[in-house]
Each structure stands twice: as C-alpha cells, then as structure tokens.
C-alpha cells in the first residue's frame, strides 16, 4: 500500500467520528425539543385544569329521608288546573338493567338557583353521548318535570335530584330510572353561553315564525322564519324562551340547537379562539371529571367533529311516552319508563 494511502486512513476515521458525533448532537437536540414541548403541554394543561371548578359531594349530610318539605316540591306559580289528580301510590316504578355499549355519557347541567338556596335545582339536563364506533355525538334533553323515583326520597321531579344529593344522587337517579350510566358531569350557567357565543362570533339558527315573532318583541334586530344570525345577547334570549313557541318542550329544543350551533362553530376554530374560550369560559364551568378523562373525552369529541361526525338531538320523554298529571300539587310528566329506555337505547347505543 502506498504511503499516501496510509496517510488517508486516519482522515477517513475522523470523518466517521465527526459524522457519529453530529448524529448524536442532532438526537440530543431533538430530545430537548420534545422535552420542551412536553413541559409546555403539561404547563398548558395545568393552566386549563386550574381554570375549572370541581363538584363537592355529598351534600346536606347525606341523610336518607322519606319526606320532603312541602316548599321543596311545589312552585309558587304551580298551575295544575285541568290536570288529572293522581295518587302517588298508583305510580309504580320497576328495577331496570343498565344500558350497555361503547359510549361515553356526560351530563350537562344548567342551574336554576333561587334566593336562599345553597344548591340550585338542575334547570336543564342535557346528556352528551360520544359514540366512537358510530362517530356521532348525541344530545338528549330530559324534561325537568319528569316524575321519577329518587333513591332515599319521595318520588318527585327529576330536577330535584341534584339539589337533594348533588351529582352522586343525580347520576344514581338516571341509572335507576333510565338505565343510564353517567361517566361524568359538567355544570354550566346558560347565562355564560353569551361569552362562548361572543368568542365564536355568533351562531346561525333556523327558527320558526312563532320564535321569530317572540324575538322581534325582545330584540333590536329583526328576525324571520328560516335562517337567522344570532349575537350573544339574542341567543341567550332564545334559550330562555319558555312561555311561547312550544313552552318548556320548545325551550329544551332551543337549548340543544344553540349547543349544536356552537359545536359546529368550533370545528374550524383557530388557536386564538380556543385560548379565549379556555381563559374566559372555563372559570364558569364545574365538573367532576378527572384531568385524564377531560383529555380523553375532549380528544374523542373533537375527533368526531373533525371527521364530519353527526350531532343528533332527542328529548325524553317523547310525546307518546308520558302523560300529564297532578301529584301532590305538582304539575308533572309521568313517563312510560320502558318506552323511554327503548328510545334511549336506539338513539344512543344502536
């Protein structure tokens, strides 16, 4: 071998070492970047979770009672005129099996706090069901005047369960009556929806002529039957509409429609919009979901929306699955629970 060839060998070895050294540096830099991103993500999640409120259970000492104060059941404005009087003992509830399926059920609770009350009734109860297999998000409103069995208490209105025993009793009530396993609860004040709607830039809703007439009496903007743009203030008025355009049934339907409109608006939301939502809205939300559950369910829900998944709406009870009655001075809806459970199974699970 020539002398000049011998002289080249160390130089080639040095190049290999330099190449290996360069790869190692690149790997270290990549690891540092990944670590920095993970730390940033963790700090961001801690910031997000720190904004949320948390439920406290149990309430009122957790005592089991068989009688409720009269004022706890009846409303001063109760109107039972024309309703059939039914003895409470004539309404019989049976034990039911829990509905099963790969579905996440989250109960969205809207509050109705009255003066002097420590805990409000659940004014609105909307079940958000994430079905990954079907790629759908289903919203089910439960009428607050449903007459149901509440474990440890007299049978009474569904919306009393949260006031008497918080989310624990509320979830148990849904389980024994409707066979629903609730995975978590999120409580919001529908008044706070104005902030959400302002951040997403308003919503577009299809409304009826009766709804348009109601809105025109209460808004500076003009509404017509069909598609209309709603700013935050008008959307709040729309969700509160009760004594017109369908009464309480119409009100729960309007709440679902506004939630759907917000969800569709979030499909294409940018990072600035999402950050504003986190910063301004989360402080008004209370939940018993763990941090891990929030990440999992939010990822599932956003994934369904991003893939063009459908959002369906439903109401319990359906028109043919209940009758109106006067029980102990309360105007209530007595449900056919078997029909209700069949409807829920078909809408959410099948």
Where are the model-predicted features located?
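Non-catalytic, solvent-exposed segments at the cell envelope interface
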Residues: 2-29, 37-350
């Amino acid at each position: 071998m020539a002398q000049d060839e011998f002289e080249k060998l160390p130089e080639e070895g040095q190049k290999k070492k330099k190449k290996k050294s360069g790869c190692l540096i690149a790997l270290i830099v990549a690891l540092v970047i990944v670590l920095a991103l993970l730390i940033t993500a963790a700090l961001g999640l801690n910031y997000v979770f720190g904004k949320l409120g948390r439920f406290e259970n149990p309430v009122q000492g957790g005592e089991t009672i068989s009688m409720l104060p009269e004022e706890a059941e009846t409303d001063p404005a109760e109107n039972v005129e024309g309703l059939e009087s039914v003895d409470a003992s004539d309404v019989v509830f049976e034990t039911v099996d829990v509905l099963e399926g790969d579905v996440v059920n989250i109960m969205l609770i809207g509050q109705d706090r009255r003066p002097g009350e420590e805990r409000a009734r659940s004014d609105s109860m909307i079940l958000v069901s994430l079905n990954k297999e079907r790629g759908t998000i289903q919203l089910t409103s439960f009428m607050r005047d449903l007459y149901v069995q509440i474990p440890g208490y007299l049978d009474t209105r569904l919306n009393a369960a949260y006031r008497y025993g918080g989310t624990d009793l509320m979830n148990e009530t849904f389980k024994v009556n409707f066979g629903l396993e609730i995975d978590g609860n999120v409580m919001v004040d529908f008044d706070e929806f104005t902030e959400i709607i302002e951040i997403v830039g308003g919503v577009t809703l299809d409304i009826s002529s009766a709804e348009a007439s109601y809105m025109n009496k209460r808004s500076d903007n003009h509404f017509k039957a069909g598609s209309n743009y709603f700013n935050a203030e008008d959307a709040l008025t729309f969700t509160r509409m009760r004594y017109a355009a369908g009464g309480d049934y119409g009100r729960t339907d309007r709440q679902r429609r506004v939630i759907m409109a917000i969800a569709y608006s979030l499909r294409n939301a940018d990072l600035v919009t999402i950050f504003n939502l986190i910063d301004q809205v989360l402080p008004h939300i209370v939940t018993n979901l763990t941090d891990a559950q929030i990440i999992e369910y939010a990822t599932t829900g956003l994934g369904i929306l991003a893939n063009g998944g459908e959002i369906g709406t439903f109401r319990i009870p359906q028109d043919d699955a209940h009758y109106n009655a006067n029980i102990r001075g309360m105007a209530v809806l007595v449900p056919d629970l078997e029909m209700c459970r069949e409807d829920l199974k078909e809408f959410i699970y099948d």
